[in-house]
């Protein structure tokens, strides 16, 4: 099973890349994390936020593996504890197939893409920089995995 993080945005600061890479390399080979960056659409006077989100959604869809489980990050998504994320990860592994976790652009995710998602999830009630979300998501996935393995990384 592969965890694929599909994130709108590119040219992240080095510390974001390093933070993401640190947690991605900690994952076991059978549960690796891959990042696919989606070039954001430029907003102009003639393009509405809805148009931008639709164009980005088409790029996101093209990056998704066929038949993958889609988890869209959204401010109105389900607020999970780390233990609940560990339970979800266990379920995803049991069901098999890849899981794509989608981080939208500055305007968010297209409503049609969110409707297609198997799950809407939020990392925090706080507004976070999109680059930071990559690092936090990778860390939480590693922490969730560590819970499933009784690894000492996560202490209650």
From Swiss-Prot:
It is found in: Cytoplasm. The keyword Methyltransferase applies. It is an enzyme of class 2 (transferase). Keywords: Cytoplasm, Methyltransferase, rRNA processing, S-adenosyl-L-methionine, Transferase. Disulfide bonds: none annotated. It holds the Pfam family SPOUT_MTase. One of its GO terms (molecular function) is rRNA (pseudouridine-N3-)-methyltransferase activity. S-adenosyl-L-methionine binds at residues 73, 104, 123-128. It catalyses: pseudouridine(1915) in 23S rRNA + S-adenosyl-L-methionine = N(3)-methylpseudouridine(1915) in 23S rRNA + S-adenosyl-L-homocysteine + H(+). The keyword Transferase applies. GO terms for cellular component: cytoplasm. SUPFAM superfamilies: alpha/beta knot. Its EC number is 2.1.1.177. InterPro entries: Alpha/beta_knot_MTases, RlmH-like, tRNA_m1G_MTases_N. Specifically methylates the pseudouridine at position 1915 (m3Psi1915) in 23S rRNA. Homodimer. Belongs to the RNA methyltransferase RlmH family. This is Ribosomal RNA large subunit methyltransferase H. It comes from Ralstonia nicotianae (strain ATCC BAA-1114 / GMI1000) (Ralstonia solanacearum).
């Amino acid at each position: 099973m592969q965890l694929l993080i599909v994130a709108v945005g590119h040219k992240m600061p080095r510390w974001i890349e390093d933070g993401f890479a640190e947690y991605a390399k900690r994952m076991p080979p059978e549960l690796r994390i891959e990042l696919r960056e989606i070039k954001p659409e430029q907003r102009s006077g003639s393009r509405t936020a809805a148009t931008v989100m639709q164009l980005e959604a088409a790029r996101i869809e093209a990056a998704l593996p066929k038949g993958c489980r889609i988890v869209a990050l959204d401010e109105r998504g389900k607020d999970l504890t780390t233990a609940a994320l560990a339970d979800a990860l266990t379920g995803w592994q049991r069901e098999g197939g890849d899981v794509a976790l989608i981080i939208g652009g500055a305007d968010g995710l297209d409503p049609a893409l969110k409707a297609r998602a198997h799950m809407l999830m939020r990392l925090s009630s706080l507004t976070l920089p999109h680059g930071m979300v990559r690092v936090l998501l990778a860390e939480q996935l590693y922490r969730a995995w560590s819970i499933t393995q009784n690894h000492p990384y996560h202490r209650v």
